[in-house]
Amino acid sequence: MAATTDIGIDLGTSSILVYAKGKGIVLKEPSVVAYDKDADKVRAIGEEARQMIGRTPGNIMAVRPMRQGVITDFLITERMLRYFIQKAMGRRAFRKPRISICVPSGVTEVERKAVEEATYQAGAREVLIVPEPVAAAIGSGIDITKPCGNMIVDIGGGTTDIAVISLAGTVVSNSVKISSETFDQDIIRYVRKTYNVFIGEQTAEAVKIRIGSAYPRAEEKTMEIKGRNVITGLPATITVSSDEIRGALAQTTNQIADAICAVLEKTPPELASDVSDRGIILTGGGSLLAGMDELIQ
């Protein structure tokens, strides 16, 4: 059986997805690398490294080499990409793969080139850079070649990409540095300010998933969480409600809604009419926040 040599990569701030031609999504793991500074060696990548966040000794850093959709550490990103490419290809990787890789629509040419170069260095034979909204539209089953307006809102781990696409091109777009990671930081700040308790990223993410929302819930939920009292330094347990968390997220979720409105205002009338008829396609991990679709409506 021939080796799979065409793969697609969604290189996100929070996670990385790898698609292999003819096989579908073959890998989904956190974009995290555990790096040993003393030994100058990568200790873990992906889910194993994510489990180390906040739990490593001083010589080991659990880092995200991507921030807000762009590379912040080229060498670590290259090593991470190489690892995931080899893992996705398996033993059948007799040839270097052709890789399509996504970038936010608002990246600069320098940032775009950095992603391309890191992908080549990681072992690609050919590299095709695809704007994230275009990839999201294709993945949603839309025929982007038709003369019809489609609005894509991709709330990723580092940025929110908003675009109106028609005839295989981006007519209007905007990329804002607000994301599902911003939701986590909102929760961390709220708990610290309100309860004098510090919680980690993983706890904040769990709160977001279980009781977080962008729109009022029919039934209020509560969740018990554990952290560290910032005054005494001792372990602390508190209970937060879904109403509290919605309030903590309100500024960020409203900024996303405002950014969508700003793109619509710049959209040609005919395409805006198409969007009104066809609706908005929400993608990305942040779009899974409960009530996000209702808020945008």
What annotation goes with each model-predicted range?
Residues 1-155, 163-280, 287-297:
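Nucleotide/phosphate-binding catalytic cleft detector across ATP-hydrolyzing
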